[in-house]
């Protein structure tokens, strides 16, 4: 078993100010997006569409707003609506954590639609350009989660080479034991807990870095190297992210205030299903539209 390093959440101390790793990872993510965007400018078909470095800079401004506002509101509405409706001022306590990818995705989509309207472009042309820029930012965010020792995975067999002990999960581990006597006996978890006061878990943040971040980036980046029907790159992002997130959720610990929902699926899985279906529908539409235009 591997013990999580339990990093200091503060990366840099500047007198009374503290720069946290999670915030720093957001910065890394946005910088990575800019770098990928500038690399894409070198593709002939992208250059022919009139994209410029200034467009990327302006786009990032909209992207930051969409990510922060959408991510926060998505967390409030999708995950803890009852709490925040009772404590409305707590919505603004972003330093206490609480961001939702699916909310951030909707926020960025709306922000890109506004950007497209201002630049007189079709919004799918904008999202097709942006989609390959996103996954490395997602990977950076999940790395921030791992450094913080949060959003850990479900309890697993201690003999698994990837099993990890998370100090931040101690209270959850103690509460988990009496609820799962069969697994406690099967995996000899009582002995593990007696020795470490923790239980072995999946490092699901690392799985998300691998699938939602690195793998999805290469799939999108390679797919987008050639001209595709408008909407196809965006559709592949929806399908790829949705499938990656749906899969990893089987190893990720559900939010304790929600647990598992209908059919034993988590909130993250239920929110990913519409993404997958929308992506498939958009992909079919994109290629049929191109075929119809070619035949006209």
Curated annotation (Swiss-Prot):
GO cellular component: plasma membrane
Membrane topology: Multi-pass membrane protein
Keyword match Nucleus: no
InterPro entries: Lgt
Keyword Cell membrane: yes
Compartments where found: Cell inner membrane
GO BP, one annotated term: lipoprotein biosynthetic process
Record GO terms (molecular function): phosphatidylglycerol-prolipoprotein diacylglyceryl transferase activity
Protein keywords: Cell inner membrane, Cell membrane, Membrane, Transferase, Transmembrane, Transmembrane helix
Family recorded in the similarity comment: Belongs to the Lgt family.
The name this protein goes by in its record: Phosphatidylglycerol--prolipoprotein diacylglyceryl transferase
Originating organism: Burkholderia cenocepacia (strain HI2424)
